[in-house]
Design a protein with these regions (language model features):
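Nucleotide 5′-phosphate-binding alpha/beta core
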Residues: 1-99, 103-199
Length: 199
């Protein structure tokens, strides 16, 4: 159910618990959750082509085994798979490829695959951020359908370009300026236009 519809049926406190309940976790509860999620990712990633390549045939079953078998990596370790967008090497087909700069612009770009599951998590976290940003106290937040939001992020194919479309899957907001209508504007032009529209 969309967040917009949930707002009509559930008490604000219930929504707060669903999206921001992690704030009440103890450090041990939080770490238990993080370890469980990491174990899920490990089981998905290990048998993938990229997992096999980086692990050199090893199959770690725990986070500790992964740390022992695979030291810290850099984007360089993934570049030959991610730059040409070799999705057959990944554990899940990407829904979209996002790009960002690499080494402060010394190299042209980095590509990163985002699965539908990652987009859902991104959206959930975005709603949680909006709840916390508009909260006056725990369980009380103030944003509604149609609220105007100054959009100061870079457009797609950058990660911030996902915000308007993902948020609008859950709650219809008015983005200033609309990222689809004004995608041809430069970053500074969009910021100026957004401020002008908001005044």
């Amino acid at each position: 159910m969309r967040f917009e519809d949930q707002m009509k049926k559930a008490a604000p406190e219930q929504l707060w618990q669903e999206y921001c309940g992690f704030l009440d976790m103890s450090i041990s509860e939080y770490m238990y959750t993080q370890r469980r999620l990491m174990a899920e990712q490990l089981s998905l990633w290990t048998p993938s082509g990229l997992g096999k390549k980086l692990l050199r045939g090893e199959a770690p079953r725990t986070i500790e085994e992964l740390r022992a078998q695979l030291p810290l990596t850099t984007y360089e370790d993934y570049a030959e798979v991610l730059l040409p967008k070799r999705s057959e090497m990944l554990c899940t087909e990407p829904a979209i490829w996002i790009q960002t700069t690499w080494e402060g612009g010394l190299r042209p770009i980095k590509q990163a695959p985002y699965t539908r599951s990652m987009l859902d998590t991104y959206c959930h976290n975005l709603i949680a951020c909006m709840m916390m940003a508009t909260a006056t106290r725990k369980g009380t937040f103030h944003f509604r359908r149609g609220d105007r939001v100054l959009y100061g992020g870079a457009p797609l194919p950058y990660a911030t370009g996902l915000m308007p479309s993902l948020a609008n899957e859950e709650i219809r907001l008015t983005w200033l300026p609309d990222s689809n209508e004004h995608s041809d504007l430069s970053f500074s032009e969009r910021i100026k236009k957004g401020f002008a529209m908001g005044m």
